[in-house]
A protein has these predicted regions:
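Bacterial Sec-dependent N-terminal signal peptides
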Residues: 1-19
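Short secondary-structure capping/junction motifs at helix and strand boundaries
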Residues: 2, 104-109, 154-155, 430-433, ...
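Basic side chains
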Residues: 2-3, 34, 70, 117, ...
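Alpha-helix capping and helix-coil boundary motifs
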Residues: 10, 73, 151-152, 217, ...
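Kelch-like beta-propeller repeat domains
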Residues: 11, 19-358
Length: 836
């Protein structure tokens, strides 16, 4: 028994624990006790307006409620200040609204609501204010109103109609879902009427923001959340706890996909009260009897699951205001009721955080991996004999190693994290794209590979000069080098961002570690070090993914069977979207985009083509291409299974999620750090480093090859082999350092707008290069001027598509390539006619 206890303690000590924590601390109290008030963050501090109380005679003794001068409206923090909306006074509901300047506290009238409302909820998102629920002098309001902000001149409009007859005192928030942002209306209640019983809503309804933007959404367009059945912190227990009411509560979106709820009434006690079943002493019990919620209720939009986080008695209030502290962390939670009729002056500072620590054992594993990669660079540097070894590995790379290298190169850390994140948030609809890699392998082997091998080139862009002219070669090589350096920065930055979020490792340290180690080992050892490094890193990736799949399956309640059942019940294994839309990832968009984009990558990307030239012969290169295709189809299944496993695990363990997580792409690294033993987590984090470094090393070596061969050697034809190697090494260092520095700068930028630009530029560039190589291989009569004109035409059409249509970005490659080919052919018709 003692031995088992010791073993359990030892194993627990090795776990990487990441735990959500709710921190509360008292702040300066209000001047008077109020509930149903308005609050905003004005000039660096909390500002209170309105509210109500029983200042003279207690409510239990028949006291009169006093309004100051109104209450039960909504206050919403907006850019530049706060808006106070509607409410009621002692006689009627109100429609008047105020805007309070966040700097000087001055107030100005704001556009009045379309009708007087009280006991509703409101929120702000992306330039729009939304109002939902409530009532007008006792008549329920089913409409959802919206108004642009700050351009409020358009006035309020009806954005949607709620599917429920009455939701008084609901909570409203906008948060991410698998399909984009959605407006959620949670909880609320309906009082007893002549035709219906009283009801406390224990679910929420939601609708995409994109639908609301169009206006006039009907009740059938809303979807429902699961009921607020909270399992609390004992996530392994299936014992059902009471339903949680969301009445008298406040809420806020947190992180990428959570909503947190503070305070509120007890479901059963409140339902009895509004149904008229309360006892005669209802207003005279001690505050603890009413069971106002002190714990923090959480809702996760991706898994549609609820949880409870341990809170504090300071949060056990109803009708309080939750105000985001602008420029700081957390919220101010002010006023409210301690029990029916008894108001509070309390103000509480609330923060929700997640403790993170990487741990010494994980650091040890990661350090050993990095040292091993440096040792590999030193080993291959000693074996190197001239330029052919540096650029082509002496033609002695085995076919299977070349295939694994291609696979590891194309599978960056972004892919390693985003594929699980994609199947976690949605389904498997992107998986058929990987089938296209294997399908494309056959024409690449039959037509392109012999062409590349026959010309015996070192840089892929030498082909374009031999086939067209030197300008085409220089243009393509320049664009490739620019694209690769920017890609290095992106591939360094994004995984570092996610790793920082879940491990606590400084983002700059992440970038520098991965960047410097990669630059050193690939500069020392040339392409041979890169390829064998890819093999090691590829195996780490594959075995790490397989281990994660098994670990997730056995960790889900019900094991593998439970995992499959949950996935099927929630449609997480869907492979095809059979609709005909060209703006979504429908079946034909996936197939067409997958074919074109993979054909472009495997026929015009120097990082891939260089692998074709490192094997002893053409047959070996073909086998390597097939190895990559087979791995892409079958091994990559593991990454989709990981995403599905993450969904099923967190569906059954909702409180284990980091509610502060800022992006869904961090979900897999977060699982590693929070659920796996130390050391194992370090090995899997090393796998993310490996995915990053395999891509970066290939990019660095390819840029060095392109610069040295297409520019230096092209214009310095008498350069010796030893000089070429020196130039290539310096090109590796310079290009790698530029990429590293750019990644460090990205850590200080607003990266989202840059990523949008980068994705657009990626579609523009790759489609044009793919078209050039297709023309070079298959269209012998097309001249250089026609090929360049086709390139420009393809780029122009793709740019037009991206700016003026809603076409899915997966179609850019196919469209640009097709336009390039057709334009070049049309401009070369005279050559075909002369031949005829």
């Amino acid at each position: 028994m003692k031995k088992n206890l010791f073993l359990s303690f030892f194993l627990c000590s090795l776990l990487c624990v990441a735990q959500n924590r709710v921190s509360v601390s008292p702040a300066a109290p209000l001047d008077r006790a109020v509930s149903g008030h308005y609050a905003g963050w004005i000039n660096g501090g909390l500002s209170i307006y309105g509210g109500c109380n029983f200042p003279d005679v207690p409510c239990a003794d028949g006291g009169q409620k006093v309004y100051y001068p109104r209450a039960y409206g909504a206050s919403v923090q907006v850019p530049g200040g706060v808006v106070y909306l509607g409410g009621m006074d002692s006689t009627a509901s109100l429609s008047e609204c105020l805007f309070i300047n966040g700097t000087d506290g001055t107030s100005t009238p704001f556009a009045s609501l379309p009708k007087a409302l009280d006991n509703f909820a409101a929120t702000y998102h992306d330039g729009t204010l939304y109002v939902a629920g409530g009532q007008t002098d006792g008549t329920p309001n089913k409409d959802v109103y919206s108004i642009p902000f700050p351009n409020k001149e358009e006035g309020w409009s009806i954005a949607a109609t709620l599917p429920d007859e009455c939701r008084l005192q609901p909570c409203v928030a906008v948060q991410n879902t698998a399909a984009g942002h959605a407006l959620f209306v949670f909880g609320g209640y309906a009082p007893k009427t002549e035709g219906s019983e009283a009801k406390v809503h224990t679910d929420g309804v939601y609708i995409p923001v994109a639908v609301l933007k169009k206006g006039g959404a009907i009740p059938t367009q809303w979807k429902r959340t699961s009921p607020t059945l909270a399992l609390g912190n004992n996530t392994d227990s299936k014992q059902e706890k009471p339903l949680q009411a969301i009445v008298g509560s406040t809420c806020s979106p947190v992180g990428y996909s959570h909503v947190v709820f503070f305070g509120g009434v007890d479901h059963d006690i409140f339902l009895n009260a509004i149904a008229g079943r309360q006892d005669s002493q209802y207003l005279r019990h001690a505050p603890e009897w009413y069971k106002f919620r002190k714990d923090v209720l959480t809702y996760h939009t991706i898994t549609d699951s609820w949880g409870l986080l341990p809170g504090d008695s300071l949060l056990a209030r109803a009708g309080a205001c939750l105000t985001p502290e602008v420029g700081g962390k957390g919220w101010s939670y002010s006023g409210g009721e301690l029990m029916p009729g008894v108001r509070s002056t309390d103000v509480t500072h609330v923060e929700v955080s997640n403790d993170k620590s990487f741990g010494w054992l994980n650091w040890t594993v990661l350090t050993l991996y990095l040292i091993g990669m440096l040792g590999m660079g030193i080993y291959f540097m000693r074996k190197e004999n001239g330029a052919d070894d540096f650029f082509k590995g002496g033609g002695r790379i085995p076919w299977w190693a070349a295939g694994i290298s291609i696979y590891a190169t194309m599978l960056s850390a972004i892919t390693y994290m985003t594929i699980p994140a994609k199947s976690y948030t949605t389904d498997w609809t992107y998986y058929p794209m990987l089938w296209m890699i294997l399908l494309v392998s056959f024409p690449v082997i039959k037509y392109y590979l012999p062409y590349f091998r026959k010309l015996n080139v070192t840089s892929a862009y030498e082909i374009l000069e031999q086939r067209f002219n030197v300008f085409t070669r220089m243009l393509a090589s320049t664009l490739f080098c620019i694209f690769m350096i920017v890609r290095m920065a992106i591939v360094l930055y994004l995984p570092s961002l996610a790793l920082t979020a879940v491990t606590g490792i400084d983002i700059y340290l992440c970038i520098i570690l991965m960047g410097l180690v990669t630059i050193i080992y690939c500069t020392m050892g040339g392409v041979e070090a890169v390829i064998w490094g890819d093999v090691v890193q590829g195996l780490i990736l594959v075995f790490g993914a397989i281990f994660a799949v098994i670990y997730l399956a056995v960790s889900t309640e019900g094991g593998i069977g439970g995992c499959i059942d949950i996935a099927l019940d929630n449609d997480k294994l869907r492979l095809f979207d059979w609709s005909n839309s060209w703006s979504q990832a429908t079946w034909w968009v996936i197939i067409l985009g997958g074919l074109a984009n993979n054909l472009i990558s495997y026929t015009s990307d120097q990082t891939v083509i260089q692998r074709y030239l490192t094997t002893p012969d053409e047959k070996s290169a073909g086998r390597g291409i097939l190895v990559n295709g087979v791995m892409s189809v079958f091994v990559s299944v593991a990454f989709y299974m990981i995403g599905t496993g993450l969904y099923t695990f967190y569906k059954t363990h909702p409180v284990e999620l980091d509610i502060t997580m800022g992006q869904s792409d961090a979900i897999f690294p977060f699982f590693m750090m929070s659920q796996m033993p130390a050391g194992v987590a370090g090995a899997l984090i090393a796998a993310i480093f490996a995915a990053t470094m395999s891509t970066i090393s290939s990019n660095i070596n390819s840029v060095a090859t392109a610069f040295t061969i297409d520019f230096w050697k092209r214009f310095r034809t008498s350069t010796t082999d030893s000089t070429l190697v020196v130039v290539a090494r310096w090109a590796s260092v310079v290009s790698g350092m530029i990429g590293l520095l750019l990644a460090l700068f990205m850590a200080t930028w607003d990266i989202q707008s840059f990523l949008d630009f980068f994705n657009e530029a990626l579609g523009l560039l790759t489609s044009g290069l793919g078209g050039l190589f297709f023309i070079a291989v298959f269209m012998k009569r097309v001249k250089g001027y026609a090929a360049l004109a086709g390139f420009v035409a393809g780029e122009a059409v793709v740019f037009w598509m991206s700016e003026y249509t809603d076409a899915n970005f997966l179609l850019f490659g196919a469209t640009g390539m097709a336009v390039s080919i057709v334009t070049a052919w049309l401009l070369s018709l005279d050559s075909y006619f002369r031949k005829s």
